[in-house]
């Protein structure tokens, strides 16, 4: 599952690939945003991310899409 965060006053985004159910992750993110608390997430490689939710402008949660590589179908 890919989670993309957009922050105020910057054009950069934070993208985290995390294992888990979309509904479960969305509920966890919604709770942190509502409480204006720090959100803790872990990616597929075991790295932990702490996100301050007071500067989050948007969050996109979706299934990671595999991109085709090579000339197949060209």
Predicted segments with their positions:
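Amphipathic, hydrophobic secondary-structure cores in small proteins
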Residues: 23-30, 34-48
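Short beta-strand segments
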Residues: 12-14, 49
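Short, surface-exposed polybasic-and-hydrophobic patches located at secondary-structure transitions
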Residues: 3-12, 67-74
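Short structural boundary motif marking the start of a folded domain
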Residues: 1-3, 37
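Basic, polyanion-interacting recognition surfaces, primarily
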Residues: 5-7, 17, 25-26
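A short, sequence-level motif marking secondary-structure junctions
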Residues: 17-23, 53-57
């Amino acid at each position: 599952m890919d989670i993309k965060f957009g922050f105020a006053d910057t054009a950069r985004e934070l993208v985290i690939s995390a294992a888990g159910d979309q509904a479960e992750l969305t509920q966890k993110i919604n709770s942190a945003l509502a409480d204006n608390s720090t959100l803790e997430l872990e990616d597929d490689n075991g790295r932990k991310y702490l996100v301050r939710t007071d500067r989050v402008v948007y969050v996109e949660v979706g299934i990671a899409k595999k991109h085709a590589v090579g000339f197949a179908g060209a």
